[in-house]
Amino acid sequence: VLDAVPGWTWDQLEATFQLMEIRAALGPHFVGYNTGRWDYINSVADAMAWDRSFINPNIEDITMTYGYMRNYEDRVRRAVNTADTDGRFALWQGGMEPNIPVGSEAGVAASMERAVAGARREQSEGASGKWVAHWKMVPIVRPVWAEVGEANQLGRSFPPLTYTEEDAAGLTLLEPAPRTIRGARNLLSVGIQYGNAFGQGFQAAALKPADFFGDDDILYLMEDVATGEIRLSILWEWLHKGGSLTEDDAETGARVGDLFAAALFRRLLAEEYDKLRRASDRDVHDDSKGTTLPVAREIAETYVLDQVKTPWYIDLLNINLNNHDLALAKERIQLYMTALKDESQRITENLDF
């Protein structure tokens, strides 16, 4: 996309209305579709940043059967056996399985049961396979397709693609779901942890919320940059669009209907950050607690509190890569935010040179 021209499809939301056009442009180089979860959530959140009525729920509830995710997946599967003008077909590969089968016996069993159930659902919907974040998941999910006895689902009939206003509305459809303090803590904890992992040189990392450190019944999930971005993005929505809580919270005193306000965010940020600083080296590298972790916290705080949503979270990570100086990080973040707002310019170059 560095040399993109007008008309280029920039994101997943737009791509769902141009599935056949993408295939036509790539021609014989096109193999199939993949329904990524985080990427589509990010795409919708960015596209709907202007709409104050669009507020996501807890991220745990935005599954592939939730509202806009369900409709996104359905459009992709409809394109699977729709031939292009040259008679070529394409296959659909299900979303990424982030589970890692490492933990307590009970924790692994429960997580693997969910993973297999998810794979069975995708297979029944028309997926010809899925990809996994860890090689140990291959023998766990592969039998789902092996049991069917078919190499793929080419030839299976699906309803044809349509392009109606109802189709378009479905791609951003929200449905009632929880928005809670527990959900906010999970978003914040993992969001900061990913920023810290990136600063340590890891593009992908096994993470879970700090409140579950030491609990081997709760498994780590393999996460990448989309994780950090969407988690902070949802918190930004809650704060700046008037997201209201759906459950009481005894610890903070928050009640059903309370708005997710800046003071509440700052309190949760301080508490979750403190948990990470006190965590064992197994969960948060000790050598990061005075170097990259404070920088990750600063990025998260700036991203969520700023009135204007920052479109490129990755830029804030990149301009601070190899930087362990919090004061310098604050200068770079402010420089970036000023350039973005005043000049509509990104800073993508290495600021160390």
Which ranges hold each PLM region?
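Conserved alpha/beta-domain cores
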Residues: 1-353
